[in-house]
Amino acid sequence: MTVENAKALFFERNLCALTPLDPERASAFLADLEARAREEELAGVVALLGRKKAADFLSAILDLSPFIREALTRQPRILDRIVSATPESALEAILDEISASGTVAGVSESELMTSLRQLKREAHVLIALCDLARIFNTETTTDRLTDLAEACTGAAVRFLLLDADAAGRINLPDRSNPEKDCGWIVLGMGKFGARELNYSSDIDLIVFIDETKPAIGDPYECVDTFSRLTRRLVRILQDRTGDGYVFRVDLRLRPDPGSTPLAIPVGAALHYYEGRGQNWERAAMIKARPVAGDRLSGKQILAELSPYVWRKYLDYAAIADVHSIKRQIHAHKGHGDIAVRGHNVKLGRGGIREIEFFVQTQQLIAGGRFPELRGNQTVPMLARLAERGWITQQARDALAQEYWFLRDVEHRIQMIADEQTHILPEDDEGFARVSHMMGYADPAEFSEIFLAALKVVEKQYAALFEQAPELGAASGNLVFTGDVDDPGTLETLSAMGYERSSDICRVIRTWHFGRYRATQSAEARERLTELTPALLKAFAETRRADESLLRFDGFLQGLPAGIQLFSLLQSNPRLLNLLVMIMSAAPRLADIITRNPHVFDGLLDPAIFSEVPTRAYLEERLRAFLGSATDFEEVLDRLRIFAAEHRFLIGIRLLTGAINGVRAGQAFSDLAELMVGRALEAVEAELQRRHGKVKGAKVALLAMGKLGSRELTAGSDVDLILLYDHDKDAEESDGEKPLAPSKYYIRLTQRLIAALSAPTAEGVLYEVDMRLRPSGNKGPVATHIEAFGKYQRNDAWTWEHMALTRARPIHGDEAFIARIKVDIEDVLAMPRDVRKLAGDVREMRELIAQEKPPRDDWDLKLKPGGIIDLEFIAQFATLAGYVKKTPRPFATEEVLANLDPFFADPAMVDGLVEAHRFYTNLSQAIRLCLNDSAGLDQFPPGMRELLCRVAGLPDIERIEYELLEHYRLVRAAFDKLVGHGAD
């Protein structure tokens, strides 16, 4: 407040000369106001408007501020308050009326709402008039706006306390002073707490409950009681009625607002801040101040929070915290020039936020050691920082001057329409309104002065952080503090390629609130904060940035801890890029690591990409992983964990190109053999514990299908047949609960199937398919070796002999396995009518084509000329004796490569082998990335890039062309070798 004429009436003082945009329009507005004053018989106001000084000043304001014009025209008695009283005393009278309104006997909630809205409008207009006239300086304006908000909040709180007491929900110790010891703590935050409110501010509140206070009734109901009161408080202040609103209320600065009640017990709040409080919350608490309710308890909780806000020692961790906040607020180095029109006075470059943050960061670093630096107001703290030598006198003076200048501009932007905006209008008239209200009739002059102010602030702000480590991963605002979307951040995310910027902001704020196990520790959140710009940049470089980042969020939700992974990603760009590749290209792998985050642990092995996963490699690691585990369930759980991790790691090698599709098929098969064999051993031991052994028992597992040919893909089930033998005189097992041999091995097989395929907390080992056993699902699940041989020699269909070409014993008694191999080779070597064989194969292929037609050109298996045709050629050639290699190969590609020249000429063989390898590389990648069969339109963009890489081709169109060529070649070969050309 200016000292001169402090006791003079408003229009007796020296007023800032303002000029309207349109003098004629201004005169018309003044005439309308005079007419309204006459209607309400306000003789003093009519006389005032007849005086030139008042008329000139008010007509300019009526033209420049539509909001003030509407308020005065609607309520001209506002001016009557300053006809015979000083503006200071008039404002005090309004504040007194507001304060008393909450305790008026018999007043209803709706009556209070009406009274507060009308009185607030009167005070608002008076403060604006004093501000525009320069009767109040900017500091006084913010102070009076804060007084107004505090009076309104206090009145509403007192009304609600008395109402709750009358209803018996609380027990006030003193109804004449309802706030005393009520236990309802209302803290003002941000500009409200710092007494720096702007003209159209929201008021930021945090509400706590002191459960120890006598007013609290049932402590188990107090959260619900005071949350209801808080909700009513918001309604009283915020709801729009015919009289407008009082103040918009924001409760989102409370701890974890997405999952906590509106009113939080003090103990729960302290626990949150001590364990999960974030950097920005430390900064926010600097400005916290009790503004209503139980103020004594409010001061006590702030005192208890002091060690959290003010760290005792100045250390590198504290400085790193500050830099972390800085990166969340701005990362704009290298941006273009500042544009005045459309500039955000609060959040833009050189704006108010930078000055506030300049002060708060110094306070966070030094306030622990120097209590005098713990104030909650910006400009006084600039002075304290200069006194302590933390900033220069020049910086203090420059920033203080520009702070009040920018706050002035902010107020005038908001005075136009009473909207909470901080953006300078871009249109000529809107910009001129602000310029004129600032006292500049020439907008160009105002523009020049405004730009100079921004540059001063930007220079000081940049100097403060010139030593801050740069992530170099993003440009533009990246602000994820609080619970409100930052407009600049939304723009930055959109520019980076995100389509759902608001959703992405919400997700990242969830990380910061520590709602996931991986982000509950302060250190983990700090690491993730450091990593976030790099993550955003990496995901933005995929073609579906939003989808990929949301998959990463799902991964975080399942992660048991985060520090190690976040540190690893931060220090290892290759691993970060790999994770992004998984999220963008391989939904199936992303789902796996989301459900089982432990599989990612394998990537900590630095040799993961250089060592090929051979059977010996896997055996060595399995032995170490199982260790001394002997308990049946423990062994199975360890097998499940091991299998999940190594399936994932084989997939990662394929994804990154460390191995090709053929090698991946071999590795997936080797892993499955080990897992199935070790599971059988565990099941046998468990069965023997209860039922003993069968005399002369011999057991073996026969791998069929792709496991037999060592061509498993990611997610393949395993085709198995369990074969057994025993002494002829064995009638039952020798255990406590003996079983007949046939029942014994059926029980063994059933338990093996359960061990492999039962869903558990650690997942499923493998889905098992045993339909290739003799008689399929109609036959027993375990097959005696003699029954197996007899069936294959006498009763098996051609398709069963085709399947037998891929049969391979993978686990069991060595002598028994040797016998099985001989039996299989004898069956395969049986003399056959080649023409009938070819006819059977053709008939089977035609049946498949009818019952399972190909989905599209990407159905590599079922498409004519696809994988089935190649497998049928290989199986037909094996049964017909057209494979020249000994011992007989199992893998389709190896069979094709060894076709007898008189059956298929070398050029055809080369074409078939090339086609099979092309299909294998593509199908392995597709099965790795997707859970289900899908067409091209469902392939994620990152997966398309992967397919181009594994195919060695530049684009999808070229792959499709090559596919069609291979289909044509293979189909022609099938027709020649197996089709009617073979007859």
From Swiss-Prot:
GO CC: one term? cytosol
What domain of life does the native source organism fall in? Bacteria
Instruction: Give the molecular function GO annotations.
Output: [glutamate-ammonia-ligase] adenylyltransferase activity; [glutamine synthetase]-adenylyl-L-tyrosine phosphorylase activity; ATP binding; magnesium ion binding
What are the recorded Gene Ontology BP terms?
regulation of glutamine family amino acid metabolic process
Which residue ranges does the record annotate as region Adenylyl removase?
1-468
What enzyme class is recorded for this protein?
A: transferase
Q: Which reaction does it catalyse?
A: [glutamine synthetase]-O(4)-(5'-adenylyl)-L-tyrosine + phosphate = [glutamine synthetase]-L-tyrosine + ADP; [glutamine synthetase]-L-tyrosine + ATP = [glutamine synthetase]-O(4)-(5'-adenylyl)-L-tyrosine + diphosphate
Sorted keywords for this record are:
ATP-binding, Magnesium, Multifunctional enzyme, Nucleotide-binding, Nucleotidyltransferase, Transferase
Q: Where is this region: Adenylyl transferase?
A: 473-983
Asked if the Swiss-Prot or TrEMBL record annotates the protein with the keyword Transmembrane helix, the reply is no
Q: What is its EC number?
A: 2.7.7.89, 2.7.7.42
Q: Which cofactor does it need?
A: Mg(2+)
Q: Which family does it belong to?
A: Belongs to the GlnE family.
Described function:
Involved in the regulation of glutamine synthetase GlnA, a key enzyme in the process to assimilate ammonia. When cellular nitrogen levels are high, the C-terminal adenylyl transferase (AT) inactivates GlnA by covalent transfer of an adenylyl group from ATP to specific tyrosine residue of GlnA, thus reducing its activity. Conversely, when nitrogen levels are low, the N-terminal adenylyl removase (AR) activates GlnA by removing the adenylyl group by phosphorolysis, increasing its activity.
This protein is called what?
Answer: Bifunctional glutamine synthetase adenylyltransferase/adenylyl-removing enzyme
Source organism per UniProt: Brucella melitensis biotype 1 (strain ATCC 23456 / CCUG 17765 / NCTC 10094 / 16M)
